Amino acid sequence: HASGKSSACTMIQELISPRCVDRMAFPKKVDDLVISLANHCISVFDNCSARRIGEDVSDILCQSVSGGFYTKRKLYSDMDTVTIPLKGMVVMNGCDSLVERPDLVSRVLQFNFSSIEGERLETDQKLMEEFQKVKPKILGVIFEIISCYLEEKDDVKIDNYVIRLTEFQRVAV
């Protein structure tokens, strides 16, 4: 259903790390997911299916969000290993609930989009043109928030963290 999920993902990517690679299909293999996460500061996966996010994939996504390493056997060797650092943002969209495992759920910000129908439905081109007009203002607000946080971060006190991303929660407060 048309709800603007893919367009919203493109806008997030544009704000954080504009580059040639746009939204990607979710990789079928864990190794391909690791390579994608290791090579981008933000990986945007479009039209994901919850069926692809099993235990192994969930663990990799947790490591990427929190920071971690993926170690595997080096090609053409029996005992040598390759260690790949994982630290980056992940954005995924899909029609069903994509995450179920509690450790990943605690690292996720989930947004639910309503369907867009009729006259409210816009072309991607028009939507992106409008976004480009307001993008400098959005970035200005983001930078202002970061600046305020950096000035006052030592004064921010939280007695009860409700998510694992404690630094994110500190900034949000």
Model-derived regions, located:
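Glycine-rich phosphate-binding P-loop
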Residues: 1-18
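Feature primarily recognizes SF3-like P-loop helicase cores of small DNA viruses
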Residues: 18-45, 51-59, 63-65, 69-173
